[in-house]
Amino acid sequence: MYLTVCQQLKHLSKDEFLILRELCRTAKNLTNQAIYQVRQHYFEHSQYLPYEKNYAILKTSENYRLLNSNMAQQILKEVDGSFKSFFGLLKLAKQGKYPFSSCRLPKYLPKDGYATLIVGFVRLNGNRFVLPYSAAYKKHHKPVTITIPPVLADKTIKEIRIIPKADARFFEIQYTYQVEAAQRNLNPTHALAIDFGIDNLMTAVSNRGESFLIDGKRLKSINQWFNKRNACLQSVKDKQHYGKKTTRRQAVLQRKRNNQVRDYMGKAAKQVVTYCIRNDIG
């Protein structure tokens, strides 16, 4: 099975940061190019443009040649997957199994936006990962080197994603690695019912009469603090006629809140899983 480790990319130099922004912008441009080709083919011929034909059209484009070939192909495959889902829903709609009104073509990414960099073929140099470049890009840019977290030292990494966050003010990196699934012979007659709430995030009761609570007040206070600080920053922004864009301070605040919520929810889920394993709940 596959698991994922997600981290925030830190300790980037100014040049490395700008390179990642530039590559993510190029990835967005290639994504929109790929979407355009499939959409236009559908409008003109009422047919699906497969990945192979889209690749043949775009492999000589400027955006494709600026990216490493593996990364560029991953982008085209992502677009291909989106359109396969659309045409799959369209087929169901023609059979009367899905409403036509819910079938929507994949949309373009924002013109000033960024897209995720996907590395599907990972090569490591010890505990370091060097972001792959195209031959043309490598001539004029220094390499971006990322240290792999120690927890992945003995793992087989299958894919790496670099995700721009908050208008590419910072980046997250996701490592997808392969492990053998643990086979547990738990009792299928033992069950656990979970009720989600606010002050009590989870109220869990087993069919053997045992129960436990997971506190939700900490999560509630995190959101209350965020709303209070964000309202203050929004008030200042409105007085300065800053517009609808998120400010740097708001982006930092949102990132902190999201990290705290993600950490708390992950630990709560881990506690439930551990309880089920210890009590033979299958």
Feature map (PLM): residue ranges:
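Nucleic-acid substrate recognition interfaces
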Residues: 1-282
